[in-house]
Amino acid sequence: MIRTKSAWFVVAWVAAGLIGCAAVDEAPTSNGRAPAAPEPVIAAQLAAPETRVAVVIPAATAPVIAPAEVAPVATSPQALDVVVQRAGTRLFNDALRALGNAPRDLVIDPFIDANTGQQTLAGVAAGGHLARLIAENFRPWTVRPFERKALAGNPLLLIGTLTPVALNEAGNGPPDAYRFWLTLVDLRSGRIVAKRLDRATLASVNAEPTPFFRDSPTWHMDRTTTAYIKSCQVEARVGERIDTLYQWRLPAAALLHEAIVAYQDQQFAQARRLFVQATDIADPDDLRVLGGRYLTSWRLGAKDDAAQELKRLVANGLAAGSLPLKVLFRPGSTVMLPGADLREQYRQWIREVARQASARQACLRIVGNVSRSTSATASVELSQRRAATVRWLLAQAAPTSGNRFTAQGAGWRDNLIGSGHDDQRDALDRRIEFRVVDCP
């Protein structure tokens, strides 16, 4: 078990400058926001269970791969399975040319949506497809589970993002394709070996989040997620080092992956133990830790523990200036989704936000968001009414602070997904945000 005072910390890689940038070949989705760059970190830690690891790769021995441009992407999107097969085959052939045929282990850090940081069912399917492709056609490599003990051998690391995008020139419409980035990293050097970019059709991508991310109460683009995305996408070129914060937090990412798998297998006690264990080595604002500790406490019926974890979640969001919560409503209405368990959680979330905002004497703007399933005008009106509903509940929970709470409707202007499905696939588009603002 890893603890703060007893973990074995190992210097494995040293960062070398800032990673370069290249022009993006397509526009982002309608929110148009790029994730903030994390602060550089120049050391990495690695802790495997009951194993002392001491791996230091001198800079002089690390193979240097000449920078290369990403090959042009196909002009029209194809079905996801076609895209994964094509991009994966090209990526792995590129890597074999760079590295040779020496046997290597390979791990896959689960793919994410670069707009939300969530893992989706389509991303899981793509990872499984590539693991089978390696086993069948790229025999020098052996796919290992993404766990701490596998990282001890400095394997090859495969990362990827699958993100909705608008391909029109202005980039301000609804998404009409998914952008698929694949990046292969050699952890012996910390450098990118190969990259590939492709596009998949909307209809072929199941964007429903996996159970852990579906159940998580909050969302924001934390530093660790941002570092993953920077390492995977256009900002980092072949031959360059991956983001140092991402590499530094790889042991935590592997431990959190084990915890998420346990949660999704409904092994809640095991999952909670792993989430607590990850607290010592993960970034302080990592929402997988904060959300995982809350969710597992709730699932185990430990309501007092869940309340304490909720306090940490809310405090983290308010300290950051924005706390998005997935307070979901029935499509087209201001009635919250039914279900005794869900509504009980909503009540606790809102009460805790009210309590902490009141204690801080903070002014909050409650911003409603809706899916892109109606006109712009109607979406603003509906999101305003939803925000007003939550503002009223906040004022009920903290009567003396009610005049410091205001409501605003954003419509679908700040959609992260933009599909307009009004279901779990675009649940984050219907979030309620509690933004800390200056008091009048």
Language model features with spans:
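C-terminal/domain-edge helix-coil "capping" segments
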Residues: A22-I65, E69-A102, L187-D280
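Short, solvent-exposed beta-strand/turn patches at coil↔beta or beta↔helix junctions
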Residues: A66-V83, L318-E352, V370-T377
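Periplasmic OmpA-like peptidoglycan-binding domain that tethers envelope proteins to the cell wall
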Residues: G117-G127, A131-R132, D304, L337-A340, ...
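C-terminal motif of bacterial Sec signal peptides marking the signal peptidase cleavage site
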Residues: G17-G20
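Short, surface-exposed beta-strand segments enriched in small/polar/acidic residues
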Residues: N101-G117, L323-S333, I350-A387, F405-G418
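A short, hydrophobic beta-strand-centered structural micro-motif
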Residues: L91, D105-P110, E136, R144-T183, ...
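N-terminal segment of the mature soluble domain
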Residues: V82-R86, D94-A152, A397, G402
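Periplasmic peptidoglycan-binding/anchoring modules of Gram-negative envelope and division proteins
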Residues: L80-L99, T334-V367, A395, F434-P440
